[in-house]
């Protein structure tokens, strides 16, 4: 974990396999989620995390180990079921206000998505499945901004992200996972780097220094972040 409390700036980031615009992190808007920090420190590892602005949180360790706080019941039921079936959690996302969520898992070698989302997003997911596409990441907010990532590199997104998604692929290759904030910003983890339209400067500081290409980057509009290699190494500020 790196202390981001005193940091804040606006700048373009173009270094260490990361590209995009950093916006000033304001520490006066930060309310800690101590549970998530305690859980990661106790386990000494974290593979994926998802969290809201109001304190809802979930951390995944290993294939399907988990710690959670105030998860929506539907999301918790999915996590418990994957754990019971000894599956693997592929990606998780919770919207900043905690009203929408997604869980992508692999159970018995089959990729499965579960989500609480808008009808438009459900229609996109079902259409991709009908084309034989497997979903590996679904990120969204309460305003129906979204990015869907398939295992073959196919993406679907709301119109506002089309340019960002195209530029991310051109610069860093296949998109692996996504994050969308309440303000309609997105972060895209790719084969060769991380591309974003806007990211809090607290997270940008880590991306400029981390010694691996992140597999997951989760952020909120107000500066919380989780950045990991998809295995055991992570940086976080909750």
Report each predicted region and the residues it spans.
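Short beta-strand motif characteristic of blades in beta-propeller domains
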Residues: 3, 7-24, 50-64, 91-109, ...
